[in-house]
Regions:
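N-terminal Rossmann-like NAD(P)+-binding subdomain of aldehyde/semialdehyde dehydrogenases
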Residues: 1-113
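Conserved C-terminal structural/oligomerization subdomain of aldehyde/semialdehyde dehydrogenase
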Residues: 9-18, 199, 335, 342-470
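A short hydrophobic/small-residue beta-strand
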Residues: 150-152, 329, 411
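ALDH superfamily catalytic-core signature
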Residues: 174, 210-352, 414, 462-463, ...
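Rossmann-like NAD(P) dinucleotide-binding subdomain of oxidoreductase/dehydrogenase enzymes
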Residues: 104-246, 371
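Structural signal for hydrophobic packing residues in well-ordered secondary-structure cores
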Residues: 35, 39, 54-61, 65, ...
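Short, well-ordered beta-strand elements within core beta-sheets of diverse protein domains
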Residues: 16-19, 33-40, 126, 236-239, ...
Length: 470
């Protein structure tokens, strides 16, 4: 019997989907055979095909959102916003392609001309995460296909049904099946795809642990493009603000949206000493009002479960680890059912903890640090190997100027949540958060390589120095 991959609903434990495990060699070979024909198509044809893809997703939005909600456990309202992002990615990518990789002509001497054009890499592997199993891999796939590449997509083994649905939408829209391939499988399939000699590069969104392993694996393969979008141990700093309730709302949105399963979620709250007591009390009160429930519950939940029981187990272990290191509980991490991965929002003070761990606890856990001056706040915010997102809540513009100049992160926000990033801008981080290949609007940059050509319609040449007389 062929090996199968099963997907279960986090909120119920029920079996949702099953499929045989795919063959990496077959999928890469198919993409290798088909990509040249796709690349040879005019860019206008590829744009029109991808716009049909957006329309296909729009037409299937209800079924798609329902599937995402059931497979990830996120609330249905949030799954619907993910569908909106999938649809919007096409027009955003078309604009980015035109702006960043369009043909350009440069002035040249002696009647020649210089042109800058771009070529696709060939076959690109895409490894997707489970937290946004449609939107995030789609953010690699749309610009890759637009540039003329073929794609071999392996969704997370935790959300394979969503990945399969996404690929079905591409095929239904007219993207050639040989140019949009799907690999169903677990970590072994992902490793085999990453190491396959038939790919020309890999585009990844996921954990720092996996990203670092990929970075090592590609270290002696400079001929292959590698774009890494990893996690963050993101700080949110609250300083000099009279509106404590609004600050608390922004902190809760930053830390607990998507049950904390966003790479840009706030993991650390750094708060001015004078604001500590009222702010922490306001956050604690608001966190206690958040509805944690299943995707289709009524009233609608603010957040659902984390992705599965092993993830919940790991978060509980991580919270206990903070306690044993000297953390002080503000709000306990509560698991309402030991057989399901529902967790309540949790807060823990780590101000007096020596050797605070620099780890991304990918769930609804917020660590709180009391700072006595703004320099200490920035120093604490930068006390991480990651560098994805950071936010300052303050009514003082001069403080934001200092914060922006001093913080090391790829997304730096002011009076906005850490997990807010515009789609028409680059998205990425430094340190363990990425390898300086930002995605979103700048994904066009890693999906094609520039070619510079000096051109003249007639050959003209002369050597004026260094020749003996004839």
């Amino acid at each position: 019997m062929a090996e199968e991959l099963l997907s279960h609903e986090p909120a119920t434990g029920a079996l949702l989907w099953r499929s045989p495990v795919g063959d990496v060699d077959e999928e890469v070979a198919a993409a290798r055979a088909g990509w040249a024909g796709w690349a040879a198509r005019p860019v206008a044809f590829r744009i029109e095909t991808l716009r049909r893809f957006a329309n296909t997703v729009r037409a299937r939005a209800d079924a798609f959102a329902d599937l995402i909600a059931r497979e990830t456990g996120k609330p249905l309202w949030e799954a619907k916003t993910e569908i909106d992002s999938v649809v919007a990615k096409v027009d955003i990518s078309v604009s980015a392609y035109a702006e960043r990789t369009a043909q350009r002509r440069l002035d040249s001497p002696m009647g020649a001309r210089t042109s800058v054009r771009h070529k696709p890499h060939g076959v690109l592997a895409v490894l997707g995460p489970y937290n946004f199993p449609a939107h995030l891999p789609n953010g690699h796939t749309v610009p890759a296909l637009l540039a003329g590449n073929a794609v071999v997509f392996k969704p997370s083994e935790k959300t394979p049904a969503t990945g399969a649905f996404l690929v079905e939408c591409y095929h239904a829209a007219g993207v050639p099946a040989e140019c949009m391939r799907l690999v169903i499988g677990g970590p072994a399939a992902g490793k085999a795809l990453a190491e396959h000699p038939g790919i020309d590069g890999l585009l990844f969104t996921g954990s720092a642990r996996t990203g670092l392993a990929l970075n090592r694996a590609f270290a002696n393969k400079p001929e292959k493009i590698l774009a890494l979008e990893m996690g963050g141990n993101n700080p949110i700093v609250v300083w000099d603000t009279p509106d404590v309730d609004t600050a608390a709302t922004i902190v809760v949105q930053s830390a607990f949206t998507s049950a904390g399963q966003r790479c840009t979620a706030a993991r650390r709250l750094i708060v001015q000493d004078a604001l500590y007591d009222p702010l922490v009390a306001a956050i604690d009160k608001l966190a206690g009002r958040l509805i944690v429930g299943a995707p289709h519950d009524d009233p609608q939940p603010f957040m659902g479960p984390v992705i599965d029981n092993p993830a919940a187990d790991g978060l509980q272990d991580g919270f206990v680890g903070l306690l044993t290191r000297g953390g002080r509980v503000i709000r306990h991490l509560v698991r309402s059912d030991p057989d399901l991965p529902f967790l309540s929002p949790a807060m823990i003070d780590v101000t007096d903890m020596p050797d605070r761990p620099d780890a991304e606890l990918f769930g609804p856990i917020l660590q709180v640090f009391r700072a006595h001056d703004f320099d200490e706040a920035i120093e604490e915010a930068n006390a991480t190997r990651y560098g994805l997102a950071a936010s300052l809540i303050s009514q003082t513009p001069a403080l934001y100027d200092r914060f922006w100049a001093g913080i090391r992160a790829g997304v730096v926000n002011w009076n906005r949540p850490t997990n807010g990033a515009p789609s028409n801008a680059p998205f990425g981080g430094v340190g363990w958060s990425g390898n300086h290949r930002p995605s979103a609007y700048y994904a066009a940059d890693y999906c094609a390589y520039p070619v510079v050509s000096s051109e003249a319609e007639a050959a003209r040449a002369a050597i004026g120095i260094g020749l003996r007389d004839p």
